[in-house]
């Protein structure tokens, strides 16, 4: 099957591209990190049109987004809002024109009206429902990341440990999140693609581990990984509380677990990321 991964160089996209290729699919990558002509904010974009037109299935992962640090800094800016609205208008129009089967990568934050990021993802969900596509809602997927400016909490903490010896947190760490290893996320997305006709646009397809953990506990798990290699790393919480999600806590739907279940424990997933990142500092 010819599968397009829009946002193929992002955290999830890179894993998904490799995963689907190993499964025998012909994967078409598309990401601004590859070439400037793969900038999805450019309207019209003939290259994007050709990729979507020639695809049997499309994973719409592309978004201008990062972890909490990135969102806190940029989500209220004009460029953040403009980039994402242009990406969506461009892509959804082509998906409509060529009547493609697709999955839109949304977020568990899409119901948070105080969050520009959440509102934009909600808008993407409305586009998707109008076209009969499917929506997956991600809950803090983690894995190897290339762009540290947009890094999420686990890779951010590991990087800080190696580079400064201090996990300098941006909050007090009392907020809770559900984390999912990227490989498990890929298997969930493949499952949705393979069972596409079993689902409807209104289905709550939450992609998560269904286990909640405090951010301070994530810091201590990573601290233990450093202990195991003989490197002393301190954990330094901030006095600030969570401003990105404002301690809002959603409840994940388990509907997708009728087809898929995560298999990687948090400790094992963090260990995989830690081991991979360690190679950059040896």
Predicted feature residues:
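NAD(P)-dependent short-chain dehydrogenase/reductase
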Residues: 114-118, 122-191, 221-223
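A general structural signal for well-ordered alpha-helical segments in protein cores
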Residues: 88, 154-155, 215, 219
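Solvent-exposed, non-membrane alpha-helical residues enriched in polar/charged side chains
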Residues: 49, 92, 129, 155-159, ...
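Structured catalytic cores of enzymes that bind and process phosphorylated ligands/cofactors
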Residues: 83, 112, 143-146, 157, ...
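N-terminal Rossmann-like NAD(P)+-binding domain of SDR-like oxidoreductases, especially those catalyzing
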Residues: 1-144, 272, 276-277
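C-terminal substrate-binding subdomain of Rossmann-fold SDR/epimerase-dehydratase oxidoreductases
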Residues: 7, 161-282
């Amino acid at each position: 099957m010819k599968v397009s991964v829009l946002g193929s160089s992002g955290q999830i996209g890179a894993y998904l591209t490799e995963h689907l290729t190993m499964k025998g699919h012909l994967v078409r990558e598309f990401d601004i990190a590859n070439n400037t002509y793969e900038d999805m904010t450019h309207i019209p974009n003939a290259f994007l049109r050709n990729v979507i037109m020639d695809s049997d299935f499309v994973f719409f992962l592309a978004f201008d987004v990062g972890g909490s640090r990135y969102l806190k800094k940029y989500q209220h800016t004009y460029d953040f809002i403009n980039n994402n609205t242009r990406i969506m208008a461009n892509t959804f129009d082509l998906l409509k024109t060529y009547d493609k089967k697709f999955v839109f990568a949304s977020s568990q934050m899409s119901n948070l009206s105080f969050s520009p990021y959440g509102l934009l993802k909600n808008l993407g969900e409305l586009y998707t429902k109008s076209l009969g596509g499917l929506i997956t809602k991600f809950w803090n997927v983690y894995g190897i990341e290339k762009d540290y400016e947009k890094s999420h909490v686990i890779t951010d903490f590991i990087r800080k440990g190696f580079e400064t010896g201090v996990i300098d947190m941006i909050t007090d760490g009392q907020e809770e999140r559900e984390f999912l290893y990227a490989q498990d996320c890929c298997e969930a997305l493949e499952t949705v693609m393979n069972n596409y006709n079993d689902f409807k646009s209104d289905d709550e397809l939450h992609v998560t581990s269904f286990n909640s953990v405090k951010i301070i506990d994530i810091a201590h798990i990573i601290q233990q990984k450093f202990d195991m290699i003989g490197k002393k790393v301190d954990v330094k919480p901030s006095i600030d509380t969570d401003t990105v999600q404002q301690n809002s806590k959603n409840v994940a739907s388990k509907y997708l677990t009728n087809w898929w279940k995560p298999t990687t424990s948090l400790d094992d997933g963090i260990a995989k990321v830690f081991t991979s990142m360690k190679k950059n500092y040896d």
